[in-house]
From Swiss-Prot:
The gene is purL. CDD domains: PurL_repeat1, PurL_repeat2. The keyword Kinase does not apply. This is Phosphoribosylformylglycinamidine synthase subunit PurL. Belongs to the FGAMS family. GO terms for cellular component: cytoplasm. It catalyses: N(2)-formyl-N(1)-(5-phospho-beta-D-ribosyl)glycinamide + L-glutamine + ATP + H2O = 2-formamido-N(1)-(5-O-phospho-beta-D-ribosyl)acetamidine + L-glutamate + ADP + phosphate + H(+). Part of the phosphoribosylformylglycinamidine synthase complex involved in the purines biosynthetic pathway. Catalyzes the ATP-dependent conversion of formylglycinamide ribonucleotide (FGAR) and glutamine to yield formylglycinamidine ribonucleotide (FGAM) and glutamate. The FGAM synthase complex is composed of three subunits. PurQ produces an ammonia molecule by converting glutamine to glutamate. PurL transfers the ammonia molecule to FGAR to form FGAM in an ATP-dependent manner. GO terms for biological process: 'de novo' IMP biosynthetic process.
């Protein structure tokens, strides 16, 4: 076999630009080995280095008195009271999920679970944020089916409930679906494990599954656009085993109950390379690996293959000296591989040995903290033209049926029913029951409120407003349950950052997110960036997905959206009828134009704090924020959840019925209460806009402008899309 020629062309095929390869040559002072080039290519990939976004991410607010660990660790950590901490993060598996939908989605779930339990937390909930292409295309149906089965197959088997998420459709995702997975875990605050290696001479231990050839250069693939050859990249998709993951969780948590661990890191993107480099780099030490000791699933694996493999269900641990036998006994009890594969050194370098040869010897700093950092050219996104007058071709009732049955609003029961949302017995509110999932903290009355949110059509119209709106909708959804929002994890999904227009979207969205987080005291504590989400030059809609976490003192008292008969309905917040970039505009008029609804961050905070106070005071029996589709959609969703009709009140003068019912003005909630007049009076005293909307009861939605629809008709429209699609 001829030896591989190491040159700029090979480096380019690995994802390194010409100037980056020149930088490698300068750092090394020689031509790198194949293994060294592979290590540089994955560590300098967009997926691992954040080289295009890092300077902008640093502008985000990340601290608060309740934040224990912010960005920089495997996941964010926040104080949730009673000596406990919530550990959570969201991460993407976009590119693999188009090539191999089932395994791409499944291993996305597995990877984010490991990010959380590697810090000492028992995972208690999974969520997701999914974006798919045009439903009329056969490929979209194939991807949706595979992704949903993959999420359910992995999460159900590993025993962690999938409790919430969101799903949108748009042609921009035709060749590039987004699969963003979020995991939340709970740990004792004094038992949190970090990834910084320490202790010269300490053993470095490999645990979990054996290493195979799956996933090699997965991080590089996730840092490039798709072309017409996407199907040929199937070997770069990892293969997961949720049963092994379950054993790995239990074995790691058992070891964590001892005092044996110095540092621990999962082998995620870039596998053994990223885990070893990050652990040693964070600790300011060196690391030496002997690949002869790595458990291997396939014969004849090279050092290059072992270092870049992304085989799943693997962890790297630095142990205290003398604890190897005790740790080995734990992992062998759980029928997992355990091997001492290296040691910590004082060299500040990563040294990789295999079959008596040194295959890599690289200074760590250029691989991690001193990796390339770019301030790419960008242009400020143009503000959209004003929408102008909009007429409706349909009366409100017919428009409601069309909207509530459209792919973006149709019932997700077909999806939810494939997920086990109650395994573990702590889920108090599932999808469709409340604006956020509610998961009880074991051994406590307290509970977590969890949600994922983003409105991509706002983000493409105005990335700054869209980025901010994703944050505030997350905050509203948590607030509507009565919980206090604490912190955010994000997943920034964009196109090619080398294009100034796309880079401008990234900059503007991050700016908007930061403004909203500061206004709401809602810091970002972890996250992920997924760029190059383009297929043959066409980018996805900018999609800065937000995962929100809050806490409520009594989870059983969390407010849902289901109406009971005999309640007054009150609208909290101002309505002017903003239809720009709305779902009504897209689905009814087939238009995607106009500015998204304006944001008033002070009003968001004021209105939300008022709603939360009233929930705590027992004045609100059900609550729903107003978002996609506007007010009439929110009311219909509440009616369906409680199987109770509504007699709607007259609308205010001076606003068109379709604008009132379907405008997507922000900072609004529908509150159901036993005494509407009293709630409106409380709002007036607090300077909060509020108006009566009607009263619950019966089995129809009735009101002005000819609205008279039975709940059965609304339900049939709402449930038809997925049932028909997958019949």
């Amino acid at each position: 076999m001829n030896p591989t020629v190491i040159d700029a062309a090979l480096a380019r095929s690995f994802g390194l630009a010409a100037e980056e390869y020149d930088r490698v040559l300068a750092i090394m002072g020689r031509v790198p080995t194949l293994t060294e080039l592979g290590i540089f290519s994955v560590m300098w990939s967009e997926h691992c280095s954040y080289k295009s976004s890092r300077i902008w991410l640093k502008t985000l607010p990340t601290t608060a008195p309740w934040v224990i660990h912010g960005p920089g660790e495997n996941a964010g950590v926040v104080d949730i009271g009673e000596g406990r901490a919530a550990i959570f993060k969201m991460e993407s598996h976009n590119h693999p999920s188009f090539i191999e939908p089932y395994q791409g989605a499944a291993t996305g779930v597995g990877g984010i679970l490991r990010d959380v339990f590697t810090m000492g937390a028992r995972p208690v909930a999974n969520l997701n944020a999914l974006r798919f292409g045009d439903p009329s295309l056969p490929v979209t149906k194939r991807v949706v089916d595979g992704v949903v089965r993959g999420i359910g197959g992995y999460g159900n088997c590993v025993g962690v409930p999938t409790v919430g998420g969101e799903t949108n459709f748009h042609p921009s995702y035709n060749g590039n679906p987004l699969v963003n997975a979020m995991t939340v875990g709970i740990a004792d605050q004094d038992r949190i494990f970090l990834s910084a290696a320490a202790g010269i001479g300490n053993p470095v231990v490999y645990v979990g599954s054996k290493t195979g050839r799956d996933g090699i250069h997965g991080a590089t693939m996730a840092s490039a656009e798709f072309g017409a050859d996407a199907e040929e990249k199937r070997p770069t998709v990892q293969v997961g085993d949720p049963f092994i993951e379950k054993l790995l969780i239990e074995a790691c948590l058992e070891l964590m109950a001892t005092d044996a661990i110095v540092a621990i890191q999962d082998m995620g993107a870039a596998g053994l390379t990223s885990s070893s480099v990050e652990m040693a780099g964070k600790g300011g030490v060196g690391i030496e690996l002997d690949l002869d000791s790595v458990p291997q699933r396939e014969a004849g694996m090279s050092a290059y293959e072992m270092m870049l493999s992304e085989s799943q269900e693997r962890m790297l641990i630095v142990l205290k000296p003398g604890r190897e036998d005790m740790a080995r006994a734990i992992f062998e009890k759980w029928e997992l591989d355990f091997a001492v594969i290296g040691r910590i050194t004082d060299s500040g370098r990563i040294v990789v040995k295999h079959q008596g040869r040194t295959e890599a010897d690289i200074e760590l700093a250029p691989l991690a903290d001193q990796a390339p950092l770019y301030e790419r050219p960008w242009v400020e996104p143009a503000k959209p033209a004003p929408l102008g007058p909009v007429e409706s071709p349909l009366p409100p009732g017919a428009a409601l049926l069309a909207l509530i049955g459209c792919p973006d609003l149709a019932s997700r029961a077909w999806i939810w029913n494939q997920y086990d949302g109650t395994v573990g017995g702590q889920t108090l509110r599932r999808p469709g029951q409340a604006d956020a999932a509610i998961v009880r903290i074991e051994g406590s009355r307290r509970a977590l409120a969890l949600t994922t949110d983003c409105t991509p059509r706002y983000c493409v119209a105005d990335p700054e407003t869209g980025g901010a709106q994703a944050v505030v909708e997350s905050w509203r959804n948590i607030t509507a349950t009565g919980a206090t929002p604490l912190a955010v994890t994000d997943n920034l999904n964009f196109g090619n950052p080398e294009k100034p227009a796309i880079m401008g979207q990234i900059v503007a969205a991050i700016r908007g997110m930061g403004e909203a987080c500061r206004a709401l005291d809602y810091p970002i504590v972890s996250g992920n960036v997924s760029l190059y989400n383009e297929t043959e030059g066409t980018a996805i809609l900018p999609t800065p997905a937000i995962g929100g976490l809050g806490v409520i003192d009594d989870g059983a008292a969390a407010t849902g959206i289901a109406l009971a008969p005999g309640l007054d309905l009150v609208l909290i917040g101002e309505t002017s009828g903003e239809l720009g970039a709305s779902l009504f505009l897209r689905e009814i008029l087939r238009r995607e134009d106009g500015a998204p609804p304006a944001l008033d961050l002070a009003a968001e905070k004021r209105n939300g704090d008022f709603v939360r106070r009233q929930i705590h005071a027992g004045a609100i029996a059900a609550c729903h924020d107003v978002s996609d589709g506007g007010l009439l959609v929110a009311l219909a969703e509440m009616a369906l959840a409680g199987n109770t009709g509504i007699a709607l009140a007259a609308i205010p003068e001076g606003i068109a019925p379709h604008a009132f019912w379907f405008g997507e003005d922000q900072a609004r909630y529908v509150a159901a209460t036993a005494d509407g007049a009293a709630l409106i009076a409380e709002a007036a005293a607090a300077g909060i806009p509020a108006r009566p909307l009607g009263r619950s009861g019966g089995d129809h939605l009735t009101g002005p402008d000819g609205i008279a629809i039975s709940l059965s008709e609304i339900r049939a429209a709402h449930e038809a899309f997925f049932a028909r699609w997958f019949a």
